[in-house]
């Protein structure tokens, strides 16, 4: 099968429609050749609506070819909209726990990621369960290879799966509740990746138009109207209090956060982006999971000439093995920096000093990338939050 990774909209001498149809036919032929197998659909450790809906679509398509699939992830689903999506649609998910049997799977399928954002990538590699399919819309990362690859620079992975459905890999029917819920989840996945279709291209518009006939509008409204938790609001408040603005970039550290509240960081970045004269927001904090800690951050931008993937990779660099700390797509990005042996300190004063160190270092990286001077003088409130000196 082809491993060609050239963006499909850029294949010379051929229309996009012809190439995309070839991809759906190629996927169908591959699935037919693997009939009777059991596949693990691997999502990123912290799945979003695009990943959840795309994984579900792949599972339903694969079932037509006699392939049993399990949607699996290792982290958490903590964003309130993602929790609502899972509860309302009853998507079957498996959260990996240490010791779970992964040898039961014949192959892996990576949707909305290319193995760089899932710890399961290494777990499956260690037992020689090889990737069969990669479908994604992020920048090419070359972490893994698969027999079938469809990576496109478009708004959402859910757009690609909607296209597969439009081309006959699955038939949606308004009279079948599960198909209606799938269509609704795909619509939510596309909307969430494109700021309600504002950042979407023609592919997203066509996909949304197609899905509109099959979605449950009231369910979609229920998902979108879920209230923010108190903890999310607290993190947004911290982000507002601690933000520093330079050249229309708003950068803020929010201190230590529980792993359960990880999704509050991108929500805080979304909120900071709404401020007047801000085109890019970056929010980060230290996520604590037992004795493990890492700096986790989220970037949001509405500046059309700014590529979050390039920005984060150039600002933060990579590990000794060449794995970048950050990456992204159009309008959004994220990063993770392991803290290593400095994690797990129980002394409050040392933890305060550690946060101050990482906060200053991360800000320095971003200010250097932006090309402005270092952070303004800061003072600490009694709660340890950073405040600008006037």
What are these regions (language model features)?
Residues 34-103:
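Anionic-ligand anchoring segments at beta-strand to alpha-helix junctions in alpha/beta enzyme folds, i.e.
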Residues 312-314, 318-320:
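Flexible, small-/acidic-enriched active-site or ligand-binding loops
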Residues 3-41, 45-46, 56-67, 142-280, ...:
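A structured phosphate/pyrophosphate-recognition subdomain
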Residues 84-85, 104-109, 248-258:
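Short, basic, glycine/proline-bearing loop/turn elements
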Residues 1-3, 132:
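Non-Sec secretion/translocation targeting segments of pathogen effectors
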Residues 93-96, 296-313:
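Acidic, Ser/Thr-rich peripheral helices and adjacent loops at domain boundaries
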Residues 87, 92-147, 169:
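Active-site cofactor/cluster-binding pocket
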